[in-house]
Amino acid sequence: VSQNLMRGMSDTLFQPDGTLTRGQLMTILYRMAGTPETEAATPFTDVASGRYFTDAVAWAYEAGIAEGVSGTTFAPNAPVTREQLVTFLYRYAKYQEEDVSAQGTLAGYPDAEAVSEYAQIPMAWAVEQELVNGIDGKLAPKGAATRAQIATIILRYYAIYGE
């Protein structure tokens, strides 16, 4: 919060156990990148101009960090899953030209088979870097990420790669 990457849900409420949305995550990554200027438009009909996430989604799409749930839908208000979170963060790290070659194994997790194909390399990277440790011994890739989880992951990311 002090870095202005995340804001509370109100002036007095952070809501750490609240579900993180796709729009909120793009906004966090956009702020981590320093809110770069973008002239890009998105193909997403559900990303209206003037919303808090509009520039962030446009930037993330242009930078190759984010894709929609379809060619024309981003679903900014939908919960972001844990596998989507690590995939977007993995792509952000690549965008920042960080070394993302370290990949661990998911074999120790009983739900490793549940990780979508697109998220397997990012999840293996996140596990190897100890950005994610699992929940009760599971990856829970389809589970909704919380605001507390992304705050923790950002702290771990900065500990590894710096600001």
Report residues per predicted region.
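Feature responds to low-complexity, polar/acidic, surface-exposed segments characteristic
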Residues: 2-55, 63-83, 89-119, 133-145, ...
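Catalytic cores of secreted/periplasmic or lumenal enzymes
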Residues: 123
